[in-house]
């Protein structure tokens, strides 16, 4: 948990230029203009968020990237708190590929993969803080493990986990951690793979024949709804939609699960 001088949230940072940034989301930034990112959610953001009404809600967001959804929700929400991993590789969820040098101890020399990832994520964080300033955002950022969220963050009406659980070693631990702090609703958006069927499936992506070091899982919607019911979120709305990323259209699903 990151607490300095009694302060649980990261201090705001000034970023001089878009040249210091990478952008995960295509965003029209006030005073800057349109910047292109890997994902363009502008035409489908309501579907992506399950058409949920964030009005006057306190929102917990896991993994904001460059903040497109953060600042969109903030238009109507009472507060948005985003959770990011510290820039410390002991927190990272890299798949431990032996052939990529990732199956190692924390004190080993950094691999080329890690160095490139560290630089990319640092520039993504710069993109978030540049947008934060340009949008005059009040959103707060907590740096720590989403598998062990502290009570000091307080209670939330809703949590958003969008296209993040596929990158995590233990998605159920993160869902459980969020559920402890959420009184109302959990929203999960992920890629849709109809070939996985309709049962509760969490399919492992990494294999010896690929280099998927940053992606662990593919899911069915039922995997999430079944475990969310275990956590007390038994009322579900599941929708399917398409979004643009990496110059392609992708099938996705969004689950809006609420406590009764």
Language model features: what each stretch is:
Residues 172-185, 192-194:
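A short glycine-rich, Lys/Arg-flanked "PGG" loop and its adjoining helix->strand segment in the class I
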């Amino acid at each position: 948990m990151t607490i300095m001088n009694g302060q649980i949230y990261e201090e705001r940072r000034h970023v001089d230029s878009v040249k210091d940034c990478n952008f995960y989301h295509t965003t029209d930034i006030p005073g800057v203009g349109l910047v292109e990112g890997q994902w363009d959610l502008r035409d489908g953001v309501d579907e992506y968020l399950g058409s949920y009404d964030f009005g006057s809600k306190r929102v917990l967001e896991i993994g904001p990237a460059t903040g497109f959804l953060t600042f969109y929700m903030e238009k109507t929400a009472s507060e948005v708190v985003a959770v990011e991993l510290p820039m410390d590789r002991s927190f990272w969820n890299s798949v431990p590929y032996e052939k990529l040098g990732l199956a190692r101890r924390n004190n080993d020399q950094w691999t080329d993969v890690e160095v490139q990832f560290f630089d990319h994520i640092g520039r993504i964080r710069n993109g978030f803080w540049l947008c934060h300033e340009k949008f005059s955002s009040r959103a707060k950022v907590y740096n720590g493990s989403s598998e062990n969220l502290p009570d000091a963050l307080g209670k939330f009406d809703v949590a958003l986990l969008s296209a993040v659980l596929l990158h995590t070693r233990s998605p159920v631990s993160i869902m459980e951690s969020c559920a402890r702090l959420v009184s109302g609703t959990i929203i999960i958006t992920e890629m849709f793979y109809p070939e996985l069927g309709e049962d509760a499936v969490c399919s492992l992506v990494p294999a010896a024949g690929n280099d998927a070091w940053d992606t662990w899982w593919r899911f069915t919607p039922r995997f999430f709804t079944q475990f969310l019911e275990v956590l007390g979120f038994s009322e579900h709305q599941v929708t399917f939609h398409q979004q643009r990323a990496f110059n392609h259209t992708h099938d996705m699903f969004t689950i809006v699960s609420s406590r009764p």
